[in-house]
Amino acid sequence: MSVLVYFSSSSENTHRFVKKLCIPAKRIPLIDKKEFQIKSPYILVIPSYNNGILDTAVPHQVTNFLNTLHNKFFLKGVIGSGNKNFGVNFCIAGNIISKKYKVPLLYKFELLGTNKDVINVKNGINKFWKKLNLEKKNQNA
């Protein structure tokens, strides 16, 4: 089964958004206690931090998570969240992950997201997995 994996700080903005999706999701721990490993394809939901400053926009917990071979391998897409006050760096962490790991940036939303964002993300995720599964079938044919 495909899931969402997400990181949320103590503000819980991303957590609250992901809960509204009603999709199976696993949270990257705030405190790196032990290796957190995903063993199936997933989409990463990631907020941008530190006013979108490039060097620190991706939380270190996410960097550590993606430095694990399994986690890197199963990453299939990314959804970014952020604050529009960051200007051109709005959702920059999603852009960074998308480029670095060569996965599509599927959607961007601000802070807690709107009801429209929830609908768009749910529909987009369903379409994305269907497309990915179809491509996989065609490769195996």
UniProtKB/Swiss-Prot annotation:
One GO-annotated biological process of the protein: protein modification process
InterPro entries, A to Z: Flavoprotein-like_sf (IPR029039), RNR_Ib_NrdI_bac (IPR020852), RNR_NrdI (IPR004465)
Coiled-coil spans in chain: none
Source superkingdom: Bacteria
Short name of any one Pfam family annotated for the protein: Flavodoxin_NdrI
Gene Ontology molecular-function annotations: FMN binding
Function: Probably involved in ribonucleotide reductase function.
UniProt record similarity statement: Belongs to the NrdI family.
Record protein name field: Protein NrdI
Source species of the chain: Wigglesworthia glossinidia brevipalpis
Origin organism lineage: Bacteria, Pseudomonadati, Pseudomonadota, Gammaproteobacteria, Enterobacterales
